[in-house]
């Protein structure tokens, strides 16, 4: 008998729930269309569902007619986007994750105090673009540990660092250690910039890896945190696949013996997880599912002020 060990927590985090609810509530309150700058979260199933209900996803505010309503995605935006919205008389609703907003505020604050800011993250990720936009002249993005050796700052320069919220804890630890060795005076926030949900999902997966021989991460290929989950397994020599649909699960799994772990990125709907489990049961009829509870998440974020009445 083979087992699927189903990680808990998995799937939607509080920031994703809030962001999706913002678009849903806006559609209920004002009707279609509701424009959304960037995909509200990085999951094709979520985006397609909201499109069917009247959301229009755009990358450039010039695609939003003057006076219309626009929602900013959970990943955040640079300040100039907000300014453009005001100039064009757009009614904007901010669905930026509360934890991302916290990093925006910290970057703005420390830049105003004269610090140079090191932002650990992927330069092209929309979250990093938004954070860097708070103080572009003061922010340097570090993507990998090798970048630390090339930083130009003298020891006399005050330094502050933060990270993208969806990074690998392994990578962040390595880069942070390199920063502290090179710049012992560097400071950061009292708690990690990597969000609680990213940490929980990675640590939950890590805790079951000694018990399994294969991992499925249910999530979108565009999802940073889903990709990092796949890497958690691969770095520990456990084969892992990132899939976003039961159609992506092949009979390849029959080539592997032993138990299977399943987790899901923070923007993955639970019904997709369950449909993937059903597909595995078709391939392995005697498969047993066991839930492994690593942590209980009860975080809830309030809606933006525009939607509170």
UniProtKB/Swiss-Prot annotation:
> Which catalytic reaction applies to this protein?
isopentenyl diphosphate + 2 oxidized [2Fe-2S]-[ferredoxin] + H2O = (2E)-4-hydroxy-3-methylbut-2-enyl diphosphate + 2 reduced [2Fe-2S]-[ferredoxin] + 2 H(+); dimethylallyl diphosphate + 2 oxidized [2Fe-2S]-[ferredoxin] + H2O = (2E)-4-hydroxy-3-methylbut-2-enyl diphosphate + 2 reduced [2Fe-2S]-[ferredoxin] + 2 H(+)
List the CDD domains.
lytB_ispH (cd13944)
EC number assigned by the record: 1.17.7.4
Provide the cofactor note recorded for this chain's UniProt entry. Binds 1 [4Fe-4S] cluster per subunit.
Q: Does the keyword Iron apply?
A: yes
Q: Where does isopentenyl diphosphate bind?
A: 42, 75, 125, 223-225, 267
Q: What positions does the entry give for [4Fe-4S] cluster binding?
A: 13, 97, 195
Kindly list the positions annotated as binding dimethylallyl diphosphate.
42, 75, 125, 223-225, 267
Q: Where, by residue number, does (2E)-4-hydroxy-3-methylbut-2-enyl diphosphate bind?
A: 42, 75, 125, 165, 223-225, 267
User: Which residues of this protein are catalytic?
Assistant: 127
Coiled-coil spans are none
| Record-level GO BP terms | dimethylallyl diphosphate biosynthetic process; isopentenyl diphosphate biosynthetic process, methylerythritol 4-phosphate pathway; terpenoid biosynthetic process
Q: Which family does it belong to?
A: Belongs to the IspH family.
The entry's protein name is: 4-hydroxy-3-methylbut-2-enyl diphosphate reductase
Gene, per the UniProt record? ispH
């Amino acid at each position: 008998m083979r087992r699927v060990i189903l990680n808990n927590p998995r799937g939607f985090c509080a920031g994703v729930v809030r962001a999706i609810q913002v678009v849903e509530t806006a559609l209920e309150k004002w009707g279609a269309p509701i424009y959304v700058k960037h995909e509200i979260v990085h999951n094709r199933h979520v985006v397609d569902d909201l499109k069917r209900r009247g959301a229009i996803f755009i990358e450039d505010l010039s695609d939003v007619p003057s006076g219309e309503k626009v929602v900013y995605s959970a990943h955040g935006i640079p300040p100039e986007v907000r300014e453009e919205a005001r100039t064009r008389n757009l009614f904007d609703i901010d669905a930026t994750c509360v934890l991302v907003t916290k990093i925006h505020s910290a970057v703005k604050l420390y830049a105003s105090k004269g610090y140079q800011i090191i932002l650990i993250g992927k330069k092209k990720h929309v979250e990093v673009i938004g954070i860097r936009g708070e103080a572009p002249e003061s922010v340097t993005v570090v993507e990998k540990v090798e970048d630390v050796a090339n930083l130009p700052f003298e020891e006399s320069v005050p330094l502050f660092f933060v990270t993208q919220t969806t990074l690998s804890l392994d990578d962040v630890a390595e880069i942070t250690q390199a920063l502290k060795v090179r710049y012992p005076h560097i400071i950061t926030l009292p708690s990690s910039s990597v969000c609680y949900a990213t940490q929980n999902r990675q640590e939950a997966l890590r805790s079951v890896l000694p018990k399994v021989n294969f991992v499925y991460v249910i999530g979108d290929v565009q999802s940073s945190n889903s990709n990092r989950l796949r890497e958690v397994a691969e770095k520990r020599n456990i084969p892992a696949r990132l899939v976003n649909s039961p159609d992506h699960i092949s009979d390849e799994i029959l080539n592997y013996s032993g138990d299977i772990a399943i987790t899901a990125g923070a923007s993955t709907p639970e019904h997709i997880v369950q449909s993937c489990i059903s597909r595995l049961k078709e391939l392995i009829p005697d498969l047993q599912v066991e839930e492994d509870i690593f942590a209980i998440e009860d975080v809830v974020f309030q809606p933006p002020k525009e939607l509170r009445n």
